[in-house]
C-alpha cells in the first residue's frame, strides 16, 4: 500500500480539532470553532494560546490539517522562544554566566543542544508542553551544565544538579536528584507525540521503509494527579504504531 497524501492526517496523527488541548504549568493551548471568522487565527499571550477555526471547517482534510499545523507550530515557537529566553538567562545569571543566546528548532531527535562556542542553547519548542515546570527548568540546567562539562561523565551530572538546586558547596550534592528528574522527563510520551506531529515526515519515513504494519489514530484524555485523585485536564492526539 502506497502513501496517500489525502489521508495523511487520519493515517499518521489523527485529526487535530477542538478536542486537542495542552494544559500544563507553563502553557494553556485550546482550539475553538467560531462563527464569524473565515480562516484560522490565533490569539496569544505568554503562557496562553487560543486558536480559532471557522465553524464549518472540515478538519479531516489534508489541506486544513496542514494549515492548522503550520500556524500552531509558529505560535508554539513564539511561546517557547520567549519562555526559554526568560528562564534560561534567569538561571544563567544566578550561576555567573553571561547572557545566553536562545533559539528554538523542531529537531525531533533532541530536546535541547548546547553550542558553547557560540554561547547559545537551542531548544525543541514542543518541550514547553512538559506537564511540569521542573522538567523545563531541568532541561535548562542540563544545557547550562554543558558550558562547564561538554559530555556526560559523572561530574556533568553533579554540575547539573548543583545548578538545578542552586547550591554553592560542591560537597552538598550528588547526582541522584538530577538523574531521577532526567529519567522522569524522558518518560513524557506526550512530548514525543507532539514532536512527531510537528514533524510528520519522520512518520512517513517509517511508513515508506516498510517498518509500520498498522496505524491507529487516537484521541486520548490527559489526566493529572491531584489531592482529589486523577482529574482529566484535556486531550492529546496520539497514534499507535505496531512494528513488524
Predicted regions and their residues:
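Walker B catalytic acidic pair
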Residues: 143
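Active-site-proximal or metal-binding-adjacent scaffold patches in catalytic folds
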Residues: 1-138, 147-244
Amino acid at each position: 500500500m502506497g502513501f496517500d497524501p489525502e489521508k495523511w492526517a487520519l493515517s499518521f496523527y489523527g485529526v487535530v480539532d477542538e478536542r486537542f488541548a495542552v494544559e500544563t504549568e507553563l502553557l494553556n493551548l485550546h482550539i475553538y470553532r467560531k462563527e464569524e471568522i473565515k480562516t484560522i487565527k490565533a490569539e496569544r499571550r505568554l503562557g496562553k494560546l487560543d486558536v480559532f477555526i471557522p465553524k464549518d471547517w472540515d478538519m479531516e482534510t489534508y489541506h486544513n490539517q496542514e494549515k492548522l499545523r503550520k500556524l500552531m507550530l509558529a505560535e508554539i515557537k513564539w511561546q517557547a522562544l520567549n519562555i526559554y529566553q526568560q528562564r534560561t538567562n534567569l538561571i544563567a545569571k544566578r550561576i555567573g554566566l553571561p547572557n545566553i543566546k536562545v533559539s528554538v528548532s523542531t529537531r525531533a531527535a533532541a530536546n535541547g543542544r548546547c553550542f558553547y562556542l557560540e554561547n547559545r542553547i537551542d531548544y525543541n519548542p514542543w518541550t514547553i508542553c512538559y506537564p511540569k515546570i521542573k522538567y523545563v527548568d531541568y532541561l535548562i540546567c542540563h544545557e547550562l551544565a554543558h558550558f562547564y562539562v561538554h559530555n556526560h561523565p559523572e561530574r556533568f551530572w553533579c554540575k547539573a544538579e548543583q545548578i538545578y538546586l542552586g547550591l554553592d558547596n560542591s560537597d552538598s550534592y550528588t547526582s541522584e536528584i538530577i538523574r531521577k528528574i532526567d529519567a522522569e522527563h524522558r518518560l513524557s510520551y506526550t512530548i514525543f507525540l507532539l514532536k512527531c506531529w510537528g514533524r510528520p515526515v519522520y512518520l512517513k519515513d517509517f511508513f515508506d521503509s516498510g517498518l509500520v504494519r498498522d496505524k491507529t489514530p487516537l484521541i486520548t484524555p490527559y489526566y493529572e494527579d491531584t489531592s482529589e485523585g486523577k482529574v482529566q485536564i484535556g486531550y492529546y492526539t496520539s497514534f499507535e504504531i505496531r512494528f513488524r
